[in-house]
Amino acid sequence: MIKFVGNPRLVSCCEVSSVAEAVEYCESKSILGVDTETTGLNFMEETMTMLQIGDGDVQFVIDTRAVDISPMRKVLESKDIIKILHNVKFDYKFLRKSGIRLENVWDTMLASQVLNCGKKASHSLANLVSGHLHIEMSKDVRTTFIGHTGEFTESQIVYGAKDVEYLLQLQAIQVKLVEELDMVMLMQLENDAALAYGDIEFNGIGLNIPVWKELSATAEKQRVEMELKLDNFIATKPSLSAFNMSSFQTDMFIEDTEIRKIDVKWTSPKQVLEVFNTYGIDVEDVNANTLHVFRKDEFIDLYIKYKEQAKLSTSYGDKFLNNVDSDGRVRTSFKQILNTGRIASSGPNMQQIPANNDYRNCFIAGEDDWVFVSSDYSSQELAIIATGSKDPVWLAALTEGKDLHSVCAELVYGEQWKDSAEEDCAYYVYSTEANVMSYKKDSNGVDVRCYPKQKCNCPAHKKLRTNVKSINFGLAYGMGPNKLADTLLITERAAEKLIKDYFKAFPSIENFLRNLGLYGLQTGHIKTFAPYRRMRWFPEWKGYNTSQKDKGKIERASKNTPIQGSGADMCKSALVMVRDHIHHNKLPVKIVMTVHDQIDTIVHKDYADTWKYTLQDIMGASTLDIIPSGLLKADTNVSETWEK
């Protein structure tokens, strides 16, 4: 039964009701379908026009332009009633604009993504309704809500009510599938995390526009300078003379050295490829991965640096300011579930903001007397590998605060590492200063001095440490000899030897990764660590008939997904705990960003120091489900601007 709350003249297709009746009815239910219709997609510029809520028996369709929906808060914010939505972040932001927070939700879109992680599938409501319920939703009616300003038609009211029915039917099917795959905890995590991401998208992050414009101007100037360096390189090479301009226009206001005399558009991959082929570099494209192996060549190195600078100038130049909303804040949009369980952001991509603080510091709290309190995990993926492999060296190094990369380098390189130590090497030096000197018990329980094994500045050690560090972090991405060779600019044979020596020193890590790879090859899927056990499917898996190429892809993904995915599960758990703590205690704190394993909040400065320690405790507590030893710690800082 449809009950309409709005203009009483529209009664031919349904009963007329009130918000009070809707609240009374919905309060008595344990599960409800919820949907909204809006005039557009951007909550900052558009408005909510319809709220639909109900169960399989009664659906209330409320014209939010005509009535006050604030009484619905007690239903929508109740933690005792499950609210089913599709793409909850979208509806949540419009509801928050109306002063209502959501709690205890089930997102049918996220459920589909969880169940089909790794597979190519559409997660739209229309496709799910068609696939599971065998009902075709009307596209014609769906599009009529955009920009709609008049009274609702009967077809629009019926369409809105049907959405509620479909959501309830879909969720009933999804619950069974989630239970069969033992992903109930994961689904709860994703549903709760969606509200935290919704808060971030709603809150936005402030931007210091004048400082950003200064950076943009500097970046563009440097791009032009690098463009001229590329031109000058061509001008000195007779073999590339075909790319010289036959004539060029001078300008009395521009220095001759600043006038381009080379007929190459460096932003055109096609033209650049022609230049490289003429130069003698035989490649099929000019992508960074392709060119990296040739980086020792001065010309290629210069071009790669130019591309990096050009990206700063274009992606993070004046064009970026188009992302600033009317309130001076930047709002991104999160894609919550990638194949590994990690997130991505777009419009703009905040995860790709240059890590250096020149750019990060342009982002501000944007509220008087508010500051940033940010927290990130220290060596999160390394701690996950140590926990999964139970490697004694890794566990000891991380537990005792030693520099893991240096410890690994010592074991991999042996005598070469020892012979490369300088006289004042911080890895070996004895000292009575705190954090430099350390003690341990011998077999008789007596304190003995031991090397602090901290990162040092010895030139040779730096190189050896970098080599091993590349492997340590590369483990999380399934790095092989080819990639390692490209990264370190060494031969593939040298990379193979380095990896062999590495696994000889750390057999437990080799076994851990091998077993992950075998599991994926044998089952066609891989899981993250307990308790969430996120499942990633491999559609290309065909048992014994899987091609060698696909076997390689599956093996690599099986090694990195549990590491990256468990890290993602941990970060989402932290976000949920932070959000719950803020709301439960009504704190003057807002979550404004999350990038990789970092959570960024803004807080009134009078509460900043207190919140710093609270946030650090929450970040630590959120790791214990996955790393019960408490091995992983968080670094938390207070700052005036956003920092790495």
Go through each PLM region and give its residues:
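Short amphipathic alpha-helices in soluble, non-transmembrane regions
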Residues: W611-M619
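Active-site-proximal helix-loop-helix substrate-binding element of RNase H-like nuclease domains
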Residues: I2-C13, N42-E179, M187-N191, Y197, ...
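Conserved "right-hand" nucleotidyltransferase catalytic core of DNA-directed polymerases
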Residues: M1-C14, T36-E37, V164, L168-D358, ...
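Conserved catalytic core of nucleic-acid polymerases
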Residues: F202, V330, K335, Q416-K418, ...
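Short acidic, Gly/Ser-rich segments with clustered Asp/Glu that frequently serve as metal-coordination loops
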Residues: I31-M44, Y377-I384
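A short acidic-Thr-Gly-centered motif at the start of a beta-strand
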Residues: V16-S30, K74-E77, A355-V371, H583-H584
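Short hydrophobic beta-strand that contains or immediately precedes a catalytic carboxylate
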Residues: L32-V34, L85, V105-W106, F372-D376
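Short, contiguous acidic/charged loop-to-helix segments that flank catalytic cores in large enzymes
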Residues: L291, Y316, F320-D325, L338, ...
